[in-house]
Amino acid sequence: MWSRIVRKLNFLKLKSGVLPYTRFENEYAPVMQEDISKAAQKLKPYYEQYITHVSRADMAMSLELAAFVYALCAKKGYKTLLDLGSGFSSFVYRLYASENIGVQVLSVDDDAQWLEKTKGYLRQHGLPDAGMLTLDQFLQQPATKFDCVLHDLNFVEVRINYVQRVLEATANSGVLILDDVHKPDYLYQVLDLLKQKSVSIYDLKPVTLDSYNRYALAVLQG
């Protein structure tokens, strides 16, 4: 019982270090609700098709997160994008890339069959399926930095093992987005891992909370 109390107190301390979304807006990217709403309106037809024909809504990234990511990319003008856990995020990144010259996208998955399914979905919408790697292929690649990294790989029990790797793949001026932090054990592990790092952590709940109570965190270097 004492260990549970200590863990709970430690968890509260860790959560107290998470900065509010208003700080993210003011200090990094002024992504306003209007920007996110416009992005959601743009993405919604594609999203509804995706959760009807490709993946269940509770397994796919939320429309809220998709809209935020798209709006953030547009606001910051990112040129290098990485998503771990291919799917609708791979579509969002490539849709943005198709509208902006010189954007490079890399999508990674630990399920080769699902990666092929994502490729098919991209081709269906006239988007390139280049830059799609299995997790093993990605881990064997030379270290590369990305402006925007979305870590949504597999289930959180697997995902936690690669937080350090994706943090290393995030550019100094870039952002790492960690989804599904509504799960207390995962959130605790993430915050405990990051407490020794020179990072700032921001609560994206106000702009990414969905009907399943899922939401995300943003992590900035320095």
Enumerate the language-model features and the residues they cover.
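SAM cofactor-binding core of SAM-dependent methyltransferases
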Residues: D58-G131, L135-D136
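Membrane-proximal basic amphipathic "stem/tether" segments
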Residues: M1-T52
